[in-house]
Amino acid sequence: MDRFDQRQIYEACMHACLVAVREGFPHLDIRDIADPPHEWFDAALARQVVMHIMIRDFGWPKRRVVEVEARSREAINRALRTIDERMLTPRFAAHYQAMKARARSLLFVVTSETEAA
């Protein structure tokens, strides 16, 4: 991974988030989290967690996420609000923190391996 290539960095962050959230929702496939079937509310929630980690925790601008993920600003804002509200419950907050920590550790492994090469 070229640490100066914003596209590669974004993709590495997204991949780390998808894998971490997949581990948090083990009954879902990554493809179902990336593009949730319309009637799958758990897949939609998992996707919202991914967007929340990307924006709130990894610091990607909402505008960039909207463009790259081909989502509307309203969909991204709704995802952020939904997860912010769910974070008020301790059980969900603990689960979210575990997924966030896993995403960070996965991203650290990717960047460490790249720098070592």
Model-based region annotation:
Residues 86-106:
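Short Lys/Arg-enriched helix C-cap and helix-to-coil transition segments
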Residues 1-21, 103, 112-117:
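General nucleic-acid-binding
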Residues 55, 79-80, 84-87:
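DNA major-groove recognition helix of helix-turn-helix
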Residues 43-60:
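Short, amphipathic alpha-helical "recognition" segments used to contact nucleic acids or chromatin
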Residues 63-72:
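Short alpha-helical "recognition helix" segments of helix-turn-helix
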